[in-house]
Each structure stands twice: as structure tokens, then as C-alpha cells.
Amino acid sequence: MTNIVIAGYVPGAIGRITELHATYYGSHWDFGLFFESKVASELSEFLRRFDPERDGFWTVIRGGCVEGSLAIDGAQAETEGAHLRWFIVSDAIRGQGAGNRLMEEAVGFCRRKEYPRIFLWTFKGLHPARHLYEKFGFRQVDQVEGEQWGKQVLEQRFVLALR
């Protein structure tokens, strides 16, 4: 974890985070244009309406390059829960603790904001991510066949109750 910094938004973050998602999920899960454009548009929309009193956004920087990210969308935090999104760590630093640090930042942020819960959507087969979610106390509460990422997968909803 030497030379790795956890930061917020930096110029180029939207493009790089989109690239990380598109290349990882494209090569491992055959996700394509629909997924990449969804990440780009939804991340852009989130950052345009970003409110630091409500939302969290963290990047992992190494050598001046974005190598990971995680966001907390707090727009529906009091009703639906805080939405954990765009969690990814590049192959270059995967397994070095950056994902753990991002999760610590996000969960700590939500606790300080006294949000009732954090939720996320993922899909079956992402074992390292699931392990990390469960390490932080998230529990799977739903599983359904779906195509929200442009390809049929077994979507899973995880929730961490905070109060």
C-alpha cells in the first residue's frame, strides 16, 4: 500500500473509473457498451448533483493515476438507505488493501451521518467483493435474475444495518 492515497474527486476520475469498470467487467463478464455507457452517465449524473453533506466519493490514487473508487449516494439515505456504488480497484493494486480502505471510508462516513443502512447491488460470482462486503457486516437480502447492467446475471442486493 505504499504510495497509495485515498482522495476525493480528481480531474479525469469519471473517465478513468468508467475505464476500470468497462475493462474489468468486459474481460471477465463480457459486459459491453450498455454497461460502460451506464457507468459513465450515472457516475457523471451523481457527481453533478454531489452534495458533500450527504454523499461520499473516494478515489485511490497511485502515481497520479486513479486506481480505484467507491461512492456513497445519500440522496435516499433516510428512506431506502445510502447506496454504495462504483466500487472498483484496478488489477495493478488489487489485493493490497485499497478496497478495505475504501470500505472503511464509506462505512465510517455513513456512521457519522447516522444513516440507518447502506445497500448495494452486485451479482453472483464476484467472490472477492462479496467477501469484503461480508467482512464489513453486509448481508445478502435479495437475489433475482436481472439485466440492470445490460447482461443477464443473478443480481444480489446486500444491506448493512447501521441502527
Language-model segments: which ranges?
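Active-site acidic-Proline motif in GNAT/NAT acetyltransferases
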Residues: 90-96, 124-125
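Residues that form or flank phosphate/diphosphate-binding pockets in enzymes
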Residues: 79, 97, 128
